[in-house]
Amino acid sequence: MSDTPKPPSNTLSLKRETATEAPKLEERLHKVLAQAGLGSRRALEQRISNGLIKVNGDIAQLGMSVKSGDKIELDGRSFVASALTEPARVLIYNKPEGEVTTREDPEGRPTVFETLPVLKGARWIAIGRLDINTTGLLLLTTDGELANAMMHPSSEIEREYVVRVRSPEGEEHVQDELLEQLTRGVMLEDGTAKFDTIERIGNTDSHDWFRVVVKEGRNREVRRLWESQGCQVSRLKRTRYGSVLLPRELLRGQSTELPKTQVEALRTQLKLEKDMPLALTLQPIIGQRRSAKATLHVNRNDNNKHAYHNNHSTADESRELRRFDTLRDDRGRGQGKHHFKDRLTVSGEAAAKQAHKPFKQYKPKNDRSLSEGSPATFQSWYVPEGVSTGPRNHRNAGAGNGAHPNKKSPNPNTRNTPGQQTRKSPYKYPNNAPNFPSDHATPTFNPYGNPGQKTGAGRPNNSGGKYNRNRGPRYP
């Protein structure tokens, strides 16, 4: 035997070599929630202070940080903090009048988020806001870090607007002295504000058109600057945000996505690092269900002894089990077409809606015995006991009075004619009608008619043959 060691065999194993784990990303809780698009940072901080958010099972505190992998509970749903690995996306939206830049409006007005493309695992974050009467360029992104960098005043990103202004009272047009005042600066309620650039681009008999540029995103800043000088803004439209221009071919209410090259150029301009997950976001836990409404079951007949409370809905269970339902008709084992009456004919969801309904109780049937004096009690006088009258339609079986009025009666004088169907006779004698004892009192009377004789001529004398049965007594 040689002493050379054998080469190690390639065995299958599920274990992997321990790799150096990257440091976990850590960020403030309200920042992570805002990155996921669950609201503004100020509103989320208020919810954290109210104790409405939990982190790893404990109530979150204001100012705390979370790491990737932490479990966050909000509004009855669970999320996991994870690094944002997907590339940032930027959307250009041409906002029309009448829409507000918010996710939910308490007054029920339409919002810009109702017409945007649907995302999975992320939400659109508006870069700045436009009031309900302002139209034009509105940028939205999935990168919260990019949105904050573009909105922060320290970035000094230009916002360009086209505005139509009505001059102050007593003047036909806006004077140049007023424009110089707006470029130097005007004191507003929240501090000094100014236009970085003002350019006159046209005028009419009652209005003047200007192109203005600001580097801040205060609330209604452009309108308040003009109103401070006695002017009235009748139309306002944003045409540029930083290096992004509003496309001329983009109609109002439509959106288009910014190319990835321009998105990377924006990040480079704002000095944001490349290929680094600089933000945490929330990913929903797969397989979780929304908490169903609790139901209370009370049995009134048992004085609430068997009442119970559960935290699930039968309708939800039936909806999940409905895929296993097999709708079929159960037949009996014997011959014939006898089916069970209580076969499954509805879906599980429909059955769950009727689960708490009581069974239908039928009242006992009343006694249907005939009262005295009823004409039906005299049936024994018309038909004596022991006499069989045959089926119900025997009185209508004669010639000319068929049970089916639409069918023609066969000719009684012709029998077994080739090509003609022979009429069935239940009693197998010529007139297809029985003889009653009451008919014997008047032998010349035939209540069923005789096509061979006139009325009152008596019965035909069939003195033999197979029709000589059940003729009754003979008369001289």
UniProtKB/Swiss-Prot annotation:
This is Ribosomal large subunit pseudouridine synthase B. InterPro entries: PsdUridine_s_RsuA/RluB/E/F_cat, PsdUridine_synth_cat_dom_sf, PsdUridine_synth_RsuA/RluA, PsdUridine_synth_RsuA/RluB/E/F, PsdUridine_synth_RsuA/RluB_CS, RsuA_PseudoU_synthase, S4_RNA-bd, S4_RNA-bd_sf. Responsible for synthesis of pseudouridine from uracil-2605 in 23S ribosomal RNA. It comes from Xylella fastidiosa (strain 9a5c). Its EC number is 5.4.99.22. Residues 27-96 form the S4 RNA-binding domain. One of its GO terms (biological process) is enzyme-directed rRNA pseudouridine synthesis. Residues 354-363 have a biased composition (Basic residues). Residues 371-380, 408-424 have a biased composition (Polar residues). The lineage of its organism: Bacteria, Pseudomonadati, Pseudomonadota, Gammaproteobacteria, Lysobacterales. Keywords: Isomerase, RNA-binding, rRNA processing. It catalyses: uridine(2605) in 23S rRNA = pseudouridine(2605) in 23S rRNA. Belongs to the pseudouridine synthase RsuA family. PANTHER family: PSEUDOURIDINE SYNTHASE FAMILY PROTEIN-RELATED, RIBOSOMAL LARGE SUBUNIT PSEUDOURIDINE SYNTHASE B. The keyword rRNA processing applies. GO terms for molecular function: 23S rRNA pseudouridine(2605) synthase activity; RNA binding. Pfam families: PseudoU_synth_2, S4. NCBIfam families: PRK10700.1 (NF007976), pseudouridine synthase (TIGR00093). Residues 314-333 have a biased composition (Basic and acidic residues). The active site is at 131 (nucleophile). Residues 299-476 are annotated as: Disordered. Disulfide bonds: none annotated.
